[in-house]
Amino acid sequence: MWDPDVYLAFADHRARPFYDLLSRVGAERARRVVDLGCGPGHLTKYLGRRWPDAVIEAMDSSPEMVAAAKERGIDAVTGDLRNWKPKPDTDVVVSNAALHWVPEHSDLLLRWAGQLAPGSWIGVQMPGNFESPSYAAVRALARREPYAKLLRDIPFRVGAVVQPPTHYANMLLDAGCKVDVWETTYLHQLTGEHPVLEWITGTALVPVRERLDDDAWEQFREELIPLLRDAYPPRADGTTIFPFRRVFIVAEVGSGRPAA
């Protein structure tokens, strides 16, 4: 279960990639703007400020996140973004830190590019840190007993969850889009006693928490702390540097030449 409060513990850090993504979306006006994977809606509200005349459509797979978004006044619905289809007046589609949960997201991007009208925009940001020490530590601990038998059904993501940026660039160029694709590694300066643990508790550890009872969950966290501390040692000033790679995809539909 996704916990909006835990997720928002690092809201400022998590928000920066969203704004970096939107800065490259060139739609001056929009009739309908869609946020797929809207989370608790704290960033969706910006879409209404950026395009004040647009209808804002929002969707998330988590009922808890949708409830939090509705509390912020967002007209959000619970649903699977794989089943979403654009309405004829959709001018901007945004998906921030959500599509990496969908193994077939490349197919989705191509489908959207084919369904949206020329001149529409797609903006996507996905984490690209699945080989990072934090994920490696979680996988290593999950292979140990007593956790292995409890967590063996979790498809811990490893390898090419998110493709290299050139994959998305070539794919969307071939589909006739004008593309702007890049990657950035943010060096987050975190504070607190166990900041990396608290960060991943709101994301990577969600499926682990769902399968462990309270006692096993607390034990798992306690055993994970030294692994994360070794991987991300705190500085003398008390801060912890947490590198986080992200991949950005911006495409203007029908503005390029499709491959022959």
Swiss-Prot record:
Where it sits in the cell: the answer is: Cytoplasm
GO:BP terms for this protein? methylation
One Gene Ontology term of the molecular function aspect: trans-aconitate 2-methyltransferase activity
Q: Name one GO cellular component term.
A: cytoplasm
Q: Out of the domains of life, which is the source?
A: Bacteria
Pfam annotation, one family: Methyltransf_23
Entry-linked CDD domains = AdoMet_MTases
**EC primary class:** transferase
Q: Which NCBIfam families match?
A: PRK14103.1
Q: Could you say which protein family the record assigns here?
A: Belongs to the methyltransferase superfamily. Tam family.
Q: Write down what this protein is called.
A: Trans-aconitate 2-methyltransferase
Origin organism is Mycobacterium avium (strain 104)
